[in-house]
Amino acid sequence: IKTAKFTPYDEESTGEKGTSYLKLNPKMHRDTGFYIYKMEPGASSTPHRHGGAEEFYVIEGELTDNDGTVYSAGDVVWLAPGTEHNSYSENGCTVAVFSESREDPISQKP
């Protein structure tokens, strides 16, 4: 993970700046299966809805979900299908993710 070449999320299509991913199975869509997700300091994920369940393990750093929940290194999280959220990382983080299906972007609520 430390020396692998991560692929930046396409900022124009996703709105994400400072995020990247490493797919372990390149034949699967970037949001499905198992992948490593990195957030640079100050990065935010795009608000999205999960089509299936998602599980993630915080390898290093910390991220804060839009509901204020803070996840730190060593935390394991399960998100139910249909969960809507986005995350922010003040100091950056690396997360191992398993997602059952693709994410759908949602517009931010006022």
Report the location of each language-model feature.
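A short, N-terminal "cap"/entry segment at the start of jelly-roll beta-barrel domains
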Residues: 1-31
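Short beta-strand/loop turn elements enriched in aromatics
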Residues: 26, 39-51, 101
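Short histidine-centered beta-strand/loop micro-motifs
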Residues: 35-37, 45-50, 67-68, 87-89
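Short acidic (Asp/Glu) patches
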Residues: 40-42, 60, 79-83
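Glycine- and acidic-residue-biased ligand/ion/polar-headgroup-sensing regions
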Residues: 41, 50-66
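Short acidic-glycine-tyrosine-enriched beta hairpin
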Residues: 65-85
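Ligand-binding loop in jelly-roll beta-barrel domains
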Residues: 81-108
